[in-house]
């Protein structure tokens, strides 16, 4: 599979108490490095249209991953993938709850869901636009630590969890 070489680009792990800047980097690449490479290829006048289109699609996906906190989670539990929980009594894991289960439970298209989200104030938009990828990684990491504290192993999560965390 030609996509296998990008698998390490979907997450970034570093120890609790460290920052991305001070952490040891994955030699295969990580989320931050993947975003940077995509940006470089998209902006490179020597890149052909096919490369630019592929890397633009990948960049959009990686930015989505960056904003799902467990993609900046702990290596030892694979970003919550080994933390078993229940979602409306069905077996799953914490990562899956945050990747898909909460979104699917709204039973809306992504367009409908985005239309129903709270909008940002002008000041919030400006702060987001001034942010860097590293700012977003650090924010996502802080949120990941809160996500870890939000559920216990084998806990049954449902509407209350969605209300509190989505």
Per-segment meaning from a language model:
Residues 66:
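Positively charged, low-complexity nucleic-acid-binding target-recognition regions
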């Amino acid at each position: 599979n030609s996509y296998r070489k990008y698998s390490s680009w979907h997450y970034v792990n570093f120890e609790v108490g460290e920052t991305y800047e001070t952490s040891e980097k994955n030699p295969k690449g990580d989320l931050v490095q993947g975003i940077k490479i995509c940006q470089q290829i998209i902006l490179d006048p020597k890149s052909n249209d096919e490369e630019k289109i592929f890397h633009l699609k990948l960049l959009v996906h990686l930015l989505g991953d960056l904003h799902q906190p467990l993609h900046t989670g702990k290596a030892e539990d694979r970003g919550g993938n080994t933390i078993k929980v229940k979602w409306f009594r069905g077996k799953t894991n914490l990562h899956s709850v945050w990747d898909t289960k909460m979104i699917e439970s709204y039973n809306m298209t992504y367009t409908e869901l985005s239309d129903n989200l709270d909008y940002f104030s002008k000041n919030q938009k400006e702060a987001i636009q001034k942010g860097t990828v590293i700012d977003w990684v650090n924010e996502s990491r802080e949120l990941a630590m809160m996500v870890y504290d939000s559920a216990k192993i084998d806990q049954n999560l449902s509407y209350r969890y969605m209300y509190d965390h989505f």
